[in-house]
From Swiss-Prot:
InterPro entries xrefs: Cyclin-like_sf, RB_A, RB_B, RB_fam, RB_N
Keywords: Cell cycle, Nucleus, Repressor, Transcription, Transcription regulation
Chief location: nucleus
A Pfam match: RB_B
Region of interest (Disordered), ranges: 403-426, 674-697, 721-748
Keyword Repressor in annotation: yes
Function: Regulator of biological processes that recruits a histone deacetylase to control gene transcription. May play a role in the entry into mitosis, negatively regulating the cell proliferation. Formation of stable complexes with geminiviridae replication-associated proteins may create a cellular environment which favors viral DNA replication.
Region (Domain A): 431-632
Annotated spans, Domain B: 754-885
Stated name of the protein: Retinoblastoma-related protein
Stretches for region Pocket: 431-885
GO molecular function, a single term: RNA polymerase II transcription regulatory region sequence-specific DNA binding
GO biological process: cell differentiation; negative regulation of G1/S transition of mitotic cell cycle; regulation of transcription by RNA polymerase II
Amino acid sequence: MSPAALKNMEENKTTVMTTSHSSNDGGETVKGYSDAVEVRFSDFCKSGLALDENTCTQAIKLFKDTKHLLMTNVSSIGNGTSEEAERFWFAFVSYSVKRLSEKNRDDAQQKSDDPGLTLCQILRLAKLNIVDFFKELPHFIVKAGPILSNIYGADWENRLEAKELQANFVHLSILSRHYKRACRELFLTSDASSDKQPAISNEATHVSDHHRFGWLLFLALRVHAFSRFKDLVTCTNGLVSVLAVLIIHVPVRFRNFSFNDSQWFVRKGDKGVDLLASLCNKYDTSEEVLRKSMETTNNLIANILKKKPHSASEYKNENLVNINPDGLIYYEDLMEESSLQSSLNILEKDYDDAIRNKAELDERVFINEEDSLLGSGSVSAGSLNITGAKRKFDLISSPTKTITSPLSPHRSPASHANGIPGSANSKMAATPVSTAMTTAKWLRTIISPLPSKPSAQLERFLVSCDKDVTNDVIRRAQIILEAIFPSSSLGERCVNGSLQSTNLMDNIWAEQRRLEALKLYYRVLESMCTAEAQILHATNLTSLLTNERFHRCMLACSAELVVATYKTVTMLFPAVLERTGITAFDLSKVIESFIRHEESLPRELRRHLNSLEERLLDSMVWEKGSSLYNSLTVARPALSAEINRLGLLAEPMPSLDAIAMHINFSSGCLPPVPSLQKHETSPGSGQNGDLRSPKRPCTDFRSVLVERNSFTSPVKDRLLGNLKSKLPPPPLQSAFASPTRPNPGGGGETCAETGINVFFTKINKLAAVRINGMIEKLQPSQQHIRENVYRLFQLILSHQTSLFFNRHIDQIILCCFYGVAKISKLNLTFREIIYNYRRQPHCKTLVFRSVFVDWSSARHNGRTGQDHVDIITFYNEIFIPAAKPLLVDVGSAGTTVKASNVPEVGNNKDGQCPASPKVSPFPSLPDMSPKKVSSAHNVYVSPLRSSKMDALISNSSKSYYACVGESTHAYQSPSKDLNAINNRLNGNRKARGTLNLDNDVGLVSDSMVANSLGLQNGNCASTSGAALKSEQSDS
């Protein structure tokens, strides 16, 4: 190890001690620091937050119990200083106590004279912003989780609702931007008669009273009407209804539009502008939905503000000139100066009462111009393009920032960009709101009109089974979807004041979502059955259509797409797994088929499913309670002892009757079907699920947000050949058969062995993509280790599979990088590896900050039990003892040795399952995120690195290619050439020959060219193993 690396290691080792000592004039002992920080927290609670005695006592107790965690993790919290770490810890503890203790109170206690406490108040006192708070909160949850569980019970994480709160913040950030943009477009911030400058010239430095009124009215809708289901689509519809109210009532002198001039106002007949139709056309909602939302908003105004409604058609006012008044309601003086301030005060008080003492986000922060509290990040139009200081926000919110996944197929090239022909605003830059509304339009226009029962074609398949399973399928769908989208019980709370209970709206919402999921389920199931029948050359699909687990996976996938469409805050993944009784491994089997068999699926939902598949494969399938382990015990008996010792096996999947009883389901005229659970429930079947996915250390805290996500099209797959088998897809029924059952086409394999081999192939493919992404961030002189890193990963997956148990595959990849760097004598530190990992779109800081270890499995200086440690400790204590023989093998063999010549490892503890995939060279990969070419923008060309260009183009063929930097005309510059290309692309286009450049099936990547030339991956020299020593990671 280099002297510089040793110095860094020693500096990092002493970070905690140094910061602790320096926190109080440089002379404070550890014990003194501990006592002093406790005193400071006590003052924070009593004087700063003014907590009541009971809550304050609880907070101080929790702080004492977790204080040692603060002191040992100072360097990894915030910027690494003890002062900032303290402020974060103070906020975490006070938020957790307030939130969890509040859940233990009854409503009578909550309605006391307690002034209340919101998250914003906590953060103001701690001098933190919301973005940074959510960025660091997962680390506190992982570290303090066992302590919180002991104090508040096993369900503390569900009651804390931290992920839901974060999702709520992201959605409100998006909605507030959407609302501000609309207000700037429609209204002036000052009287037009005195100031002709529109609001758009003043970058939101001033929020008008009209703007404030609209946002507070929207918050009242969220509190009183939307109840538990504050999904993005419903909220957007509510916001559009608020805009309609503003357009009708804001005095004409504040308007920044004219009904005669504006192109987006729709006229029907000679009665004037149809306002609701115009808003629906602009914001991709439906008139039926908007009218219902308008009715709710109008009732809210009448009940809270005590305003008398008038029919607009019977009321004469200059605000209503040029507007078709049919069906509209007008409130006299609603937004005139004489009553506006009073209305604002009433709405403020109503909101104060609603959030009192709940430690929730004060949603008024988005119009209070408190940028310091919101943080430096913001949502930009089209996507969350974060630059500079704003990049932090991207760590916790990226609704549309996606890359494609190599794990599942793309949609058919014939399908439309969004699954909807001729969707509106196709040339406008997409925003998170417009994307959500377009996706919801797909559900509304393509799925909702379908019948809510099996089609005639599907029914033919159901009847063709050994026995008619139609009633079984219908009953199961009803029960499972009722479990996923439950109706409100009669005993649930009602809203304050004179407004009626929100139960009715909740029930309507749930019923609509159940119907959409049901229709989608039947549609895809029919398509799958048709494809399966073609593969098997038979219409009797008994094995598949009587498989309980398969149907639950299909229902879960359909429901998840509905939830993702509406972006429902209170039903974040893996809620569908928990409510259907399946596991992540089960769901991963159907995602690819689901995408293949629903060609109309919008791009955003395809991305969501691929993002989900990556998340399932990289961590969730490896968690405790995954049915993967049940299959592994059959496919790899040598792993059974370790699996049983760690208690990883999935529990039996709950019966359908048990779920029905749990949700108090009434099946109506359909009798109970005792035969439903005859399949897959025998002891030792190994395919049993768990009603609740076991809790994990919140490694996917950003689950609400769309993560790195990337897949290739069938066209690219055919061109790249080696990424996917050219054989027809295997029958689905073998994927869901009992693990011990022989696979009909598996050459003597059991279904478990076949399933594990397919699964390992996907894991290797995902690893190849991620290894390649990190390699590209390294220096050119370091990139030759790619083959060896990938080879080592494959060997570990095959020979030391237990290293993946309860861990994230990125943790193994990071260790592979460092191990190969050491045996190659490459000057690549763990700090550099982690720095490059941080730059990956799928990066999660918990991957290198918190790695699961089980000390009882080996001799570790007397340490016992299970723990979470940093990546360096895991590498030295667990990874190296297990993987060292494989590292030596990789180092001695080098990349020139063929995969078939890899020697067996002497101490192969896990063994290799029969017919498992051989170690293969690094595959040719498609470009992960090709820049889509839009007809409204210039073409973006990325320079080709000289090293890549030299590998791509040999001397003999160089004359056939034009490279960036070389002019295509005499005395021309590359910039002029690129401008010429842009001018040609963006020039006059004939309507009949519109070029659709939104589909990526026509893009040709460098990797395709490389494959077409038959180029092989470059070889690299590698030397034998060297001493493997510690470094401290940059945490």
